[in-house]
Amino acid sequence: MQIAKNEMKIFSGNANRELAIKVSEYIGTRLADCEVGRFADGEINVKIGETVRGHDTFIIQPTCPPVNENLMELLIMIDALKRASANSIAVVIPYYGYARQDRKAKGRDPITAKLVANLLTVAGATRVMTVDLHSEQIQGFFDIPLDNLWSFPIFAKKLKEDKIVDDDYVIVSPDVGGVKRARQFAERLGGPLAILDKRRPKDNVAEILNIIGEVEGKTAIIVDDIADTARSLVNAAKAIKEKGAKRVIACITHPVLSDGAIERIQNSEIEKIYISDSISHSNLPDKFSVVSLAPLLGEAIVRVRKNLSISILFRQ
């Protein structure tokens, strides 16, 4: 009797099918047959349309808004693949929803990022891949391998192509928590670093107290992982411009863009904003430029499949 060959199969939910198609095309394969629909009462119905027994499977599904719908789709897809005897189930979550709920900021707060990690693991995921986790300590919430991929190489490449870094420039971290991300960006480009000192009196509100570093007369490139309402981003751009920056550019990995964020950015001091396609958006204004994560995710998936190093992707 012939033994079935262990193949790689890539699945996608409904959260960002466009990105999943780009990733599969980069790898040189097709998306596996899977239908994620709804029953009449709204319950999620997953139908796997081909065999996965003994195969290495990858599910591409960011848990972006509507976060609970997309997370539940992902969990049910994992369960379906596990019960169909997949050899491995790697979940590729470009944007990890609930990542900002990673600690108890005050009494009786939940740590929802940990809860999501538990749900993914119990459902049957054997590996998680994500991009620019909001808090790196979330990696410790998992008892299965987690690959936190960095987006800075693709943004740095795009900035060079668009000649943004031909002028005198500075990489700006919008807060102390993002310094490591901004420093990696600055090291990749070989440029200086500035840091905004800010505090948050309440959720989605930030007050800038000081700018550490020189921005006067320079192209300031703000590097951040998430733009939700974009109030913090717009305020940062305003403060930088008031300090004499020649122009302000932004690089944002995860464009949540809720609560009027697009209009807010349009009317801000930001000249150009580069975003990834971790979250799908359509009909964006010309000020927005989308940089695809597909090559990064595709390369990482291939390396996981072949048991090759992933960290080499982020070395100089």
Swiss-Prot record:
Annotated transmembrane regions: none
Primary localization: cytoplasm
Cofactor(s) essential for the protein: Mg(2+)
Protein name: Ribose-phosphate pyrophosphokinase
First-tier enzyme category under EC: transferase
Enzyme Commission code(s) on record: 2.7.6.1
Binding site for Mg(2+) 1: 134
UniProt entry tagged with the keyword Transferase: yes
Alphabetized Pfam families for the sequence: Pribosyl_synth, Pribosyltran_N
Catalytic activity: D-ribose 5-phosphate + ATP = 5-phospho-alpha-D-ribose 1-diphosphate + AMP + H(+)
An example molecular function term from Gene Ontology annotations: magnesium ion binding
Active-site residues, Swiss-Prot/TrEMBL: 198
Pathway the protein takes part in: Metabolic intermediate biosynthesis; 5-phospho-alpha-D-ribose 1-diphosphate biosynthesis; 5-phospho-alpha-D-ribose 1-diphosphate from D-ribose 5-phosphate (route I): step 1/1
GO CC terms of this entry: cytoplasm; ribose phosphate diphosphokinase complex
Keywords: ATP-binding, Cytoplasm, Kinase, Magnesium, Metal-binding, Nucleotide biosynthesis, Nucleotide-binding, Transferase
Subunit structure, as described in the record: Homohexamer.
Statement: the UniProt record of this protein carries the keyword 4Fe-4S: no
Binding positions (Mg(2+) 2): 175
Gene3D superfamilies: 3.40.50.2020
UniProt xrefs under SMART domains: Pribosyltran_N
InterPro entries in the record: PRib_PP_synth_CS, Pribosyltran_N, PRibTrfase_dom, PRTase-like, Rib-P_diPkinase, Rib-P_diPkinase_bac
